Regions:
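Short, surface-exposed "cap/lid" segments of acyl-processing enzymes
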Residues: 3-60
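Active-site-proximal flexible loops/turns
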Residues: 33-34, 63, 97, 120
Length: 153
């Protein structure tokens, strides 16, 4: 059975001599404990010779800040001699795509169920309550700005 270890901000699992690194970001909510929420998937990847690094986070409306924090966490544990692949699920895809290096620090990205919905669509209760309270709330960057940032890379 693979052994998970916490190294700095990252949870890691993998062989002692990996063929590469998979940097994983989970979806909103599930990303708080990726070593538990995505255990079967990530351990299967590690059994195939990859060192899996997961950054855990609590969701916020500032997705750009989360993307920078995740990127810094991965960068602090970088294995310079190994190829890097980025794997994201849902909001984790968005965070990888918003990384400050614009993907230049990896050989490829696998993005599962990319979520770029607005705040009121992602959080239905917010969509119901915000108009009644006379407030408007949106992620930063919002959906249109996210697509503009991604396509300009």
């Amino acid at each position: 059975m693979p052994t998970w270890r916490q190294r700095g901000e990252l949870w890691t699992v993998g062989p002692t001599q990996p063929k590469g690194v998979v940097q994983f970001l989970g979806g909103s909510g599930l990303g708080a404990s990726p070593q538990l929420s995505y255990k079967r998937l990530l351990e299967a990847v590690s059994r195939r010779g990859w060192l899996v690094q997961c950054w855990s986070y609590l969701p916020s409306f500032d997705h750009q800040l989360l993307a920078v924090q995740a990127w810094r966490g991965f960068r602090s544990q970088r294995q310079n001699d190994l190829p890097v692949l980025r794997l994201g699920h849902s909001m984790g895809c968005k965070l990888h795509l918003l990384a400050p290096d614009q993907g230049r620090g990896c050989r490829g990205e696998a993005l599962l169920s990319f979520n770029n919905f607005s705040a009121d669509r992602s959080i239905p209760l917010l969509g119901e309550l915000a108009p009644r309270l006379g407030v408007r709330s949106e992620f930063s960057p919002g959906p249109e700005e996210t697509l503009r940032l991604i396509t300009s890379q």
